[in-house]
């Protein structure tokens, strides 16, 4: 089994539904995001174009974050998902420095919540209860939520344009494997040699 994702940029409208769904599902503190949509503007009026690129952990086969981790906290599980064992994480941030995609986050200070000065609400205390100061956090394809093997990652389910397809790349009959075989795809930062398992179908002319 090797989980992966194909993102069709022809279908992405930059709505950030994936960003919101990820944040809501994982209950991340203010300022912490496991995914986001990058916006790049090209050209000039009246021929300006907006290029949207959803960004998340690539769950690389040759993950730089895993190789530099001195404690084994960053690892690839049996399904090829790059994860963090927070019991082993010492907060050295080597993995953040090594990741060329800048998709890891570090909780550097006590969580203040969305209403500064008023303390955490009861809901926020529940949501943020699993986060520890001095630890690194990232996307795990919703493995920690138990969604991966069933309904799939929250970002995939939330996309109104069906731009994301998730599944087992090792299963030739899976939708994601068939899409990978049928479309011209690319990975971000191929020059880094990390072999991501998140692929992109480019827009026309991109």
Predicted regions and their residues:
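Non-ligating segments of multi-cofactor redox enzymes
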Residues: 1-206
